[in-house]
Amino acid sequence: MNISSAQFIPGVHTVEEIEAEIHKNLHISKSCSYQKVPNSHKEFTKFCYEVYNEIKISDKEFKEKRAALDTLRLCLKRISPDAELVAFGSLESGLALKNSDMDLCVLMDSRVQSDTIALQFYEELIAEGFEGKFLQRARIPIIKLTSDTKNGFGASFQCDIGFNNRLAIHNTLLLSSYTKLDARLKPMVLLVKHWAKRKQINSPYFGTLSSYGYVLMVLYYLIHVIKPPVFPNLLLSPLKQEKIVDGFDVGFDDKLEDIPPSQNYSSLGSLLHGFFRFYAYKFEPREKVVTFRRPDGYLTKQEKGWTSATEHTGSADQIIKDRYILAIEDPFEISHNVGRTVSSSGLYRIRGEFMAASRLLNSRSYPIPYDSLFEEAPIPPRRQKKTDEQSNKKLLNETDGDNSE
């Protein structure tokens, strides 16, 4: 049997075959034998792979986006031969849902030229048949392409182009390295991103968390919470080389072939079940920081100095308020809280959805209605009413009665 990229075909492959094939194809499994999926997670694991195959980016879409990137690169070369256009984000790390936007970055030797080159690039793209907006900011211009009328990429073509965002590129390299270490990461991340999107809790503009924030929460769980861990912490490896970019150390152990085998053989269903339960009941958002800079993953807001909201000047000279209601330390830009957009009501909704997911997966009823895990929640009002204090307290203090891991 050969199941490429963990493709589950209902009625053809069993859950045991899928999980066995995943471990057989991982370099980390060379010294271990496959362990059967626990009965309690077989059906959920099967369901997860069925959903995963529906939501992941197709080979056709991926090739179309690569073709679009090639076209955009030709446009850039015509106005700036020395500049480089690179992809970053979920498309490049392998963690993209279908119909995802493209995130691109123009790299140049001198930031002084960015405004001039950005405007010329935008004008060249418009002449080439793309449509969009040029957002002139004080220090970092942004090009937002919203459709294409000439090159065959369609009216739904979406692309954001930034300039000299080197830290984001290194973040992408880190995530890409983790996807190469274990084939379970990609479906797990995509399912969590899809779940957050369906539950309306992945919008930084409305007080919840970005998709990148959820990716970091998944990684934190797989590195620092579950025992034995699925991944080592590549940032803290004694073999990693220091590399300073924009004042931050972006070095990590990228010698993946030398990383020792993982001893965690949990099924995808089991990992997701534990992930939802941990953030529903065990992670303490009022006190803890999701961090990758401590060997044990333990860091408090007090230690970090992230206890009160602060303000700073953004790239467009606007005042940005940094909140620490949910604290997620960026792996490289450690002064940046990835969860800074989360409001009190946003955390209430996020925590509530984690609890709802955990309760569903812990249900004693049979069959468990797994479809409801991804049922679309109603769109919340633009202005959230202040959460009732009593209800908030009840939510934050709810426990699942199970302290085992």
Curated annotation (Swiss-Prot):
Phenotype upon knockout?
A: Stabilizes urg1 transcripts.
State how changing residue 332 to A affects the protein, per the record.
Reduces capacity for binding RNAs
List the keywords (alphabetical). Answer: ATP-binding, Cytoplasm, Magnesium, Manganese, Metal-binding, Nucleotide-binding, Nucleotidyltransferase, Transferase
This chain's protein is named: Terminal uridylyltransferase cid1
Lineage at the top is: Eukaryota, Fungi, Dikarya, Ascomycota, Taphrinomycotina
Annotated consequence of substituting residue 282 to A:
Impairs binding to RNA. Also impairs binding to RNA
Which Gene Ontology BP terms does the record give?
Answer: negative regulation of nuclear-transcribed mRNA poly(A) tail shortening; polyuridylation-dependent decapping of nuclear-transcribed mRNA; RNA 3'-end processing
Q: What is its EC number?
A: 2.7.7.19, 2.7.7.52
- Which SUPFAM superfamilies does the entry mention? Nucleotidyltransferase, PAP/OAS1 substrate-binding domain
